[in-house]
A protein has these predicted regions:
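Beta-rich, blade/repeat-based domains predominating
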Residues: 24-39, 68-84, 114-139, 169-188
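A short beta-strand motif characteristic of beta-propeller blades
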Residues: 14-24, 60-66, 107-118, 160-170
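Structural signal for beta-propeller blades
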Residues: 50-53, 94-97, 106, 149-151
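Conserved beta-strand positions in repeat-built beta-propeller and related beta-rich domains
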Residues: 44-47, 86-92, 131, 142-145, ...
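A detector of repeated loop/turn-to-beta-strand junctions in beta-rich toroidal repeat architectures
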Residues: 49, 93, 121, 147-148, ...
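Beta-propeller domains
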Residues: 9, 32-33, 37-39, 43-67
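Short loop/turn segments that connect beta-strands within beta-propeller blades
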Residues: 56-60, 100-104, 155-159
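Blade/loop signatures of beta-propeller domains
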Residues: 1-15
Length: 188
Protein backbone atom coordinates (compact mmCIF):
# COMPACT_ATOMS: atom_id res chain seq x y z
CA UNK A 1 0.00 0.00 0.00
CA UNK A 2 1.25 3.51 -0.83
CA UNK A 3 0.41 6.35 1.59
CA UNK A 4 0.90 10.09 1.15
CA UNK A 5 0.71 12.23 -1.95
CA UNK A 6 2.88 13.75 -4.67
CA UNK A 7 6.58 13.65 -3.75
CA UNK A 8 5.78 12.54 -0.19
CA UNK A 9 4.63 9.01 -0.93
CA UNK A 10 5.70 6.08 1.20
CA UNK A 11 5.27 2.34 1.04
CA UNK A 12 3.43 0.89 4.03
CA UNK A 13 5.12 -2.34 5.20
CA UNK A 14 2.89 -4.34 7.52
CA UNK A 15 4.73 -5.79 10.58
CA UNK A 16 7.97 -4.09 9.53
CA UNK A 17 9.24 -3.63 13.08
CA UNK A 18 9.99 -6.11 15.87
CA UNK A 19 8.45 -4.75 19.08
CA UNK A 20 10.10 -5.69 22.43
CA UNK A 21 8.56 -8.75 24.05
CA UNK A 22 7.38 -6.97 27.19
CA UNK A 23 3.80 -6.23 28.31
CA UNK A 24 4.12 -2.48 27.74
CA UNK A 25 6.28 -2.95 24.64
CA UNK A 26 3.57 -5.05 23.03
CA UNK A 27 0.99 -2.45 24.04
CA UNK A 28 3.10 0.36 22.52
CA UNK A 29 2.17 3.62 24.15
CA UNK A 30 1.25 6.88 22.50
CA UNK A 31 4.07 7.79 20.14
CA UNK A 32 4.84 11.51 19.97
CA UNK A 33 8.30 11.44 18.46
CA UNK A 34 10.09 9.68 15.61
CA UNK A 35 13.49 10.69 14.21
CA UNK A 36 15.95 9.14 11.77
CA UNK A 37 19.67 9.29 12.55
CA UNK A 38 22.49 9.75 10.07
CA UNK A 39 22.98 5.96 10.11
CA UNK A 40 19.30 5.48 9.11
CA UNK A 41 18.34 4.24 12.55
CA UNK A 42 14.74 4.99 13.47
CA UNK A 43 14.31 6.26 17.04
CA UNK A 44 10.81 6.19 18.55
CA UNK A 45 9.78 7.95 21.79
CA UNK A 46 6.56 6.46 23.16
CA UNK A 47 4.64 6.19 26.42
CA UNK A 48 5.54 2.57 27.08
CA UNK A 49 8.39 0.86 28.86
CA UNK A 50 11.00 1.25 27.49
CA UNK A 51 10.18 4.69 26.09
CA UNK A 52 13.02 4.84 23.54
CA UNK A 53 13.12 2.17 20.85
CA UNK A 54 15.81 2.25 18.15
CA UNK A 55 15.42 0.14 15.02
CA UNK A 56 17.65 -0.45 12.02
CA UNK A 57 16.17 0.21 8.59
CA UNK A 58 15.06 -3.44 8.35
CA UNK A 59 12.87 -3.01 11.46
CA UNK A 60 15.11 -4.96 13.85
CA UNK A 61 15.25 -3.57 17.39
CA UNK A 62 18.87 -2.60 18.09
CA UNK A 63 18.53 -0.57 21.30
CA UNK A 64 15.95 0.33 23.94
CA UNK A 65 16.09 2.40 27.10
CA UNK A 66 14.29 5.20 28.94
CA UNK A 67 12.16 3.40 31.49
CA UNK A 68 11.77 6.62 33.51
CA UNK A 69 9.91 8.52 30.75
CA UNK A 70 6.29 7.51 31.42
CA UNK A 71 5.09 10.81 29.91
CA UNK A 72 7.26 10.59 26.80
CA UNK A 73 6.36 13.46 24.50
CA UNK A 74 8.86 15.57 22.56
CA UNK A 75 11.79 14.02 20.69
CA UNK A 76 14.29 16.20 18.83
CA UNK A 77 17.47 15.02 17.09
CA UNK A 78 20.35 17.54 17.10
CA UNK A 79 24.02 17.48 16.21
CA UNK A 80 26.68 18.99 18.48
CA UNK A 81 30.37 18.92 17.55
CA UNK A 82 29.71 16.20 14.98
CA UNK A 83 27.80 13.91 17.38
CA UNK A 84 24.05 13.24 17.36
CA UNK A 85 21.99 13.78 20.52
CA UNK A 86 18.34 13.54 21.53
CA UNK A 87 16.31 16.15 23.38
CA UNK A 88 13.48 14.48 25.33
CA UNK A 89 10.51 15.98 27.17
CA UNK A 90 8.32 14.13 29.64
CA UNK A 91 4.92 15.77 30.05
CA UNK A 92 4.20 13.90 33.33
CA UNK A 93 7.45 14.43 35.28
CA UNK A 94 8.38 17.78 33.70
CA UNK A 95 11.79 16.44 32.70
CA UNK A 96 13.69 17.99 29.80
CA UNK A 97 16.97 16.20 29.05
CA UNK A 98 19.56 15.89 26.32
CA UNK A 99 21.06 12.41 25.89
CA UNK A 100 23.38 10.63 23.54
CA UNK A 101 21.81 7.96 21.32
CA UNK A 102 22.45 5.30 24.00
CA UNK A 103 20.63 7.25 26.73
CA UNK A 104 23.53 8.83 28.60
CA UNK A 105 22.27 12.16 29.96
CA UNK A 106 24.50 15.08 28.98
CA UNK A 107 22.26 18.02 29.94
CA UNK A 108 19.13 18.66 31.97
CA UNK A 109 16.96 21.77 31.82
CA UNK A 110 14.86 22.61 34.86
CA UNK A 111 11.54 24.39 35.03
CA UNK A 112 12.21 28.14 35.09
CA UNK A 113 12.12 29.72 38.52
CA UNK A 114 9.49 32.31 37.68
CA UNK A 115 6.60 33.40 39.91
CA UNK A 116 4.06 32.15 37.38
CA UNK A 117 4.89 28.54 38.31
CA UNK A 118 4.19 29.06 42.00
CA UNK A 119 0.54 28.44 41.15
CA UNK A 120 0.48 27.10 37.59
CA UNK A 121 1.32 23.70 36.10
CA UNK A 122 4.52 22.93 34.12
CA UNK A 123 4.22 20.19 31.51
CA UNK A 124 6.84 20.48 28.73
CA UNK A 125 6.01 19.12 25.30
CA UNK A 126 8.92 19.90 22.95
CA UNK A 127 12.47 21.26 22.57
CA UNK A 128 14.16 23.06 19.70
CA UNK A 129 17.89 23.80 19.79
CA UNK A 130 19.27 26.62 17.64
CA UNK A 131 22.14 24.40 16.51
CA UNK A 132 25.56 26.00 16.25
CA UNK A 133 26.44 23.76 13.32
CA UNK A 134 23.53 25.32 11.43
CA UNK A 135 24.44 28.99 12.01
CA UNK A 136 22.75 29.10 15.42
CA UNK A 137 23.97 30.13 18.86
CA UNK A 138 22.99 26.98 20.78
CA UNK A 139 19.93 28.52 22.47
CA UNK A 140 17.33 26.03 23.70
CA UNK A 141 13.60 26.66 23.31
CA UNK A 142 11.05 24.64 25.30
CA UNK A 143 7.27 24.57 24.90
CA UNK A 144 5.09 24.16 27.97
CA UNK A 145 2.10 23.05 25.94
CA UNK A 146 0.21 20.87 28.39
CA UNK A 147 0.88 23.10 31.38
CA UNK A 148 0.68 26.85 31.03
CA UNK A 149 0.92 27.47 27.26
CA UNK A 150 4.29 29.20 27.42
CA UNK A 151 7.58 29.02 25.50
CA UNK A 152 10.87 29.34 27.41
CA UNK A 153 14.30 30.26 26.11
CA UNK A 154 17.61 29.12 27.64
CA UNK A 155 21.19 29.66 26.55
CA UNK A 156 23.24 26.65 25.45
CA UNK A 157 24.44 26.04 29.02
CA UNK A 158 20.83 25.80 30.19
CA UNK A 159 20.59 29.20 31.88
CA UNK A 160 17.07 30.63 31.76
CA UNK A 161 16.71 33.73 29.57
CA UNK A 162 13.05 34.57 28.94
CA UNK A 163 9.46 33.40 28.62
CA UNK A 164 6.97 34.12 25.84
CA UNK A 165 3.20 33.76 26.17
CA UNK A 166 2.31 34.73 22.60
CA UNK A 167 1.04 38.21 23.36
CA UNK A 168 4.33 39.48 21.92
CA UNK A 169 2.84 38.62 18.51
CA UNK A 170 -0.62 37.81 17.21
CA UNK A 171 -2.13 36.57 20.46
CA UNK A 172 -1.76 34.35 23.49
CA UNK A 173 -0.51 30.78 22.92
CA UNK A 174 -2.99 27.95 23.29
CA UNK A 175 -1.15 24.66 23.84
CA UNK A 176 2.13 25.31 22.00
CA UNK A 177 2.64 21.65 21.26
CA UNK A 178 5.95 21.68 19.41
CA UNK A 179 8.37 24.04 17.73
CA UNK A 180 11.08 23.84 15.11
CA UNK A 181 13.75 26.13 13.71
CA UNK A 182 13.60 26.54 9.94
CA UNK A 183 17.16 26.48 8.55
CA UNK A 184 16.15 26.55 4.88
CA UNK A 185 16.87 30.26 4.47
CA UNK A 186 19.99 32.30 5.22
CA UNK A 187 18.40 33.83 8.33
CA UNK A 188 16.76 31.02 10.38
Amino acid sequence: MIVGSEKFQYKWIENWVTIPDTPSGKQNGRTHGVVVTEENQIVIFNQANPAILTFDDDGKLINSWGERFAGAHGLTLVKTNGEEFLWLTDEFSGEVVKTDLDGKEVQKIHKPEISFYHTEKYSPTWVAEFEEGKRGNGDIWITDGYGSSLVHRYDKQGNYMLTLNGEEGAGKFNCPHSLFIDYRKNDP
